[in-house]
């Protein structure tokens, strides 16, 4: 899989899905599929949850994606797509939920590949979602804050 091609809508992931395919997932598909989040929000370290082996394995690859405006715009679009899922489905606002790990990944990816501002905006939007009824544990809140 070539990350830059995938993130610019020119390639497919390791399962043959395009970014558009993933953006068209139903809420049920988002909840039940656990391998897409590492693909649409890549990091420079392997996932501790899903072991497909795909990550940004060189600083050159990180720079290449970071300097590709189309790729970074699509990462931002993916973050908006994911936050809309979180707005529609509030069960993740609990003591522990796997979507909280996904939130951490999104923040880390935005910080790595887009900007601190984009990461901070996503983080602040998450805090707004839980503002009136926060059930998320303090450890997770600290992960988000420090991501």
Regions found by a protein language model. Give the residues of each.
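N-terminal leader regions that mediate targeting or early regulatory function
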Residues: 1-90, 110, 117, 125
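Alpha-helical bundle/repeat cores within regulatory domains of eukaryotic proteins
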Residues: 85-147
């Amino acid at each position: 899989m070539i990350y830059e091609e995938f993130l610019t809508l020119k390639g497919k992931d390791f399962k043959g899905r395009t970014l558009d395919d993933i953006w068209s997932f139903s809420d049920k598909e988002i909840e039940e599929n656990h391998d897409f989040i590492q693909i649409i929000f890549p990091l420079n370290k392997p996932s501790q949850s899903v072991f497909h082996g795909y990550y940004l394995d060189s600083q050159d690859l990180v720079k290449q994606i970071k300097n590709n405006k189309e790729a970074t715009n699509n990462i931002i679009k993916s973050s908006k797509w994911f936050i809309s899922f979180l707005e529609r489905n509030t069960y993740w606002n609990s003591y522990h939920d796997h979507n909280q790990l996904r939130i951490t990944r999104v923040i880390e990816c935005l910080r790595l590949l887009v900007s601190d501002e984009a990461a901070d905006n996503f983080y602040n939007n998450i805090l707004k979602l839980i503002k009136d009824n926060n059930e998320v544990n303090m450890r997770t809140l600290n992960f988000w804050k420090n991501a």
